[in-house]
Regions:
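Short alpha-helical segment
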Residues: 107-108
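STAS-typified acidic loop motif
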Residues: 3-32, 49-51
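Short acidic-hydrophobic, aromatic-tinged amphipathic segments that line or gate anion-handling sites
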Residues: 99-104
């Protein structure tokens, strides 16, 4: 399965919407997208995972590294997730204690 990403700017928030699978086979694409977002100067970044069907441990590790890089730049990171399977995985791994999770982009950009 492929991974696609689309970036939008909503006020001072950059929203990166993903669809497909975040797994070992799509890590290079995920890494490229996140690296580009790190290079640019953002106040807040939202990763919209609503279109994601699979999220594995290597992809989770990449997201954690991305969160650490953004924290060093004083950029906040948020995740949008409504898929029961993906959200449950994020909570089981305690990612929600590191990166805030919301159910919609508008909840974050208010």
């Amino acid at each position: 399965m492929q991974l696609s990403a689309h970036t939008d700017l909503i006020g001072d928030t950059t929203v990166i919407s993903f669809s497909g699978e975040l797994d070992l086979s799509t890590l290079p694409k995920l890494s490229d997208v996140l690296t580009q977002a790190t290079i640019e100067d953002h106040k807040r970044i939202v990763l919209d995972l609503d279109g994601i069907t699979v999220l594995d441990d290597p992809a989770l590790g990449l997201l954690l590294g991305f969160a650490a890089r953004l924290r060093a730049k004083n950029t906040s990171l948020h995740i949008v997730c409504t898929s029961q399977n993906i959200c449950s995985y994020l909570r089981r791994t305690k990612l929600d204690l590191i990166i805030p999770i919301a159910t919609s982009v508008s909840d974050i950009t208010k």
